[in-house]
Swiss-Prot record:
It comes from the Archaea. The gene is ef1b. This is Elongation factor 1-beta. InterPro entries: eEF-1beta-like_sf, EF1B_bsu/dsu_GNE, Transl_elong_EF1B/ribsomal_bS6, Transl_elong_EF1B_B_arc. Promotes the exchange of GDP for GTP in EF-1-alpha/GDP, thus allowing the regeneration of EF-1-alpha/GTP that could then be used to form the ternary complex EF-1-alpha/GTP/AAtRNA.
């Protein structure tokens, strides 16, 4: 079964929120069908760090990335979620 790899940039509410803390909250909020394949901090400016994530999800997910974006946006400490890339992934 093929999956889709979604590259996201997640911006925190403020500069005090660290990417590692944000990652833990997001990972805990994601349903089982979503898998975090990779994550890293991305410096933005003035001490603000975004979180870049690659999340694997089933290819046949109805509505594309909308559900994933909504779940992450609802996590406390998240200000904005940007989908940077979506690609098919098999393996």
């Amino acid at each position: 079964m093929s999956k889709v790899a979604v590259l996201l940039r997640v911006l925190p509410d403020d500069a005090e929120t660290k990417p590692e803390e944000l990652y833990k909250k997001i990972a805990a909020a994601l349903p089982e069908k979503y898998q975090v394949a990779q994550y890293q901090a991305e410096p933005i400016a003035f001490g603000l760090e975004a979180l870049r994530m690659v999340i694997l999800m089933p290819e046949e997910t109805e509505g594309g990335t909308e559900e994933l974006e909504t779940i992450i946006q609802s996590v406390q400490g998240v200000s904005q979620v940007d989908v940077l890339n979506v690609t098919r992934f098999s393996g």
